């Protein structure tokens, strides 16, 4: 046994090969990141790329020309300007420590509308111009919202339905938020945990099914109409809750997953275009299995629709519905 181990070790050492890699120089490009929403003015962040082998970090581009077009007007409908009043911190991990990069929005005065295409063009004298397009679909009406707080005291059951469009591919996202009142009348918002056995939410997570009894557990879900194209679709969700807190504890401790001390739960239901779905779907795959580890693996790229550059320019048509209003705790 010792002889076999020794031979294996010698053989392994003899098979080692050193490869010299010649990495081509990196030419920085503009990076565009932005999400158009029908509830707010257009806003994007412009930065530049760095080499994967560089020790430098991307930085904000302050003197770019950012023009917004729609599918009706030939000329730009808006010119986005830097909003220095609101700092945007972009988090990243550097040698196992989380750090932040300071960025700012280029913001316009146009509020995008649904059922329309938008294109953005970014120009800068030191970089090649970039562009990207996105489509904002029409909103979907939510019907028959039902709340169940009786069947299980540890769960809030939520169900609703909507009519899917039979003439096109549709993409959706569901998120839940808790809205709590703090001292001084200010509001605090947190993400809610969603539990569901809805088949259209994707592949079954057998680990979650074994321990929770649900095929889906998460803070948000992105899905398509593949299993219900053109149908009147019913969605059922459960939200786990904790015990009531004493009123004296209300202002001292706000836990985003303890809903009984909050006065409202908000349902956010969004419709997407295919580019937005591609981004969120690839981002989820990248987070789950895209990083290389000591055993190797295949890097899953994150979707980008920016021509001649990097980043993503996508859109969402979101509606928020308060589904469980109750008096605020005093």
Tell me what each language-model feature is.
Residues 14-330:
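A sequence/structural signal for flexible, mid-protein segments enriched
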Residues 1-4:
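Sec-dependent signal peptide recognition
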Residues 9-12:
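C-terminal motif of bacterial Sec signal peptides marking the signal peptidase cleavage site
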């Amino acid at each position: 046994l010792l002889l076999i181990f020794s031979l294996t070790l010698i053989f392994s050492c003899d098979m080692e090969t050193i490869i010299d890699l010649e990495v081509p120089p990196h030419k920085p490009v503009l990076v565009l990141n932005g999400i158009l929403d029908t509830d707010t003015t257009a806003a994007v962040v412009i930065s530049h790329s760095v080499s994967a082998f560089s020790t430098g970090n991307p930085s904000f581009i302050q003197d770019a020309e950012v023009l917004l077009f729609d599918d009706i007007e030939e000329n730009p409908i808006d010119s986005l300007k830097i909003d220095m009043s609101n700092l945007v911190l972009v988090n990243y991990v550097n040698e196992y420590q989380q750090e932040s990069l300071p960025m700012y929005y280029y913001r316009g005065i146009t509020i995008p509308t649904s059922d329309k295409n938008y294109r953005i063009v970014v120009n800068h004298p030191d970089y090649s111009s970039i562009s990207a397009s996105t489509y904002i679909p029409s909103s979907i009406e939510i019907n028959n919202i039902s709340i169940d707080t009786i069947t299980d005291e540890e769960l809030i059951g939520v169900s609703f339905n909507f009519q899917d469009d039979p003439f096109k591919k549709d993409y959706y996202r569901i998120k839940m938020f808790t809205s709590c009142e703090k001292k001084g009348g200010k509001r605090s918002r947190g993400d809610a945990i969603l539990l569901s056995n809805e088949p259209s939410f994707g592949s079954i997570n057998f680990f979650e099914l074994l321990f929770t009894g649900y095929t889906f557990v998460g803070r948000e879900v992105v899905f398509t109409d593949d299993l219900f194209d053109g149908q009147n679709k019913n969605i059922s969700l459960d939200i786990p809750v904790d015990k009531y807190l004493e009123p004296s504890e209300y202002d001292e401790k706000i836990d985003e997953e303890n809903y009984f001390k909050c006065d409202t739960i908000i349902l956010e239901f969004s419709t997407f275009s295919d580019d937005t779905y591609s981004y969120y779907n690839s981002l989820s795959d990248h987070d789950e299995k895209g990083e290389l580890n000591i055993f190797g693996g295949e890097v899953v790229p994150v979707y980008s629709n920016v021509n001649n550059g990097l980043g993503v320019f996508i859109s969402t048509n979101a509606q928020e519905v308060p589904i469980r209003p109750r008096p605020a705790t005093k």
